[in-house]
């Protein structure tokens, strides 16, 4: 017997705490400090404490987060980064912005995530990172 799993309902989640969400968004918009303001600073401090670290940096997009992570690893010109071919553009864009070459691998047929066998076959002396993407709520096989 097949089990039906409901999709995540963004509207229901929003409506469950609408007043608090609206107040927080309005406060940030009215402050004019969307990126580097006190609310972001507070979030960074709370997140760092939650993670048990001294620092956390909030960024404006997933692309920026990926780019910072790749740059922190020293990835750049002449390097290769392996990622899955069926990801969205920002994954490959972040790699390209470092000057590194994107090496795409295909998916495995069950979870539609990167195929570990293809990752292994794609590794060269220039490979500096493997950038998995966990699609559709299914974690990629990192083993």
Residue ranges, per PLM feature:
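Conserved PLP-binding active-site segment in aminotransferase class I/II-type PLP enzymes
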Residues: 1-72, 76, 97-98
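PLP-dependent aminotransferase-like
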Residues: 71-143
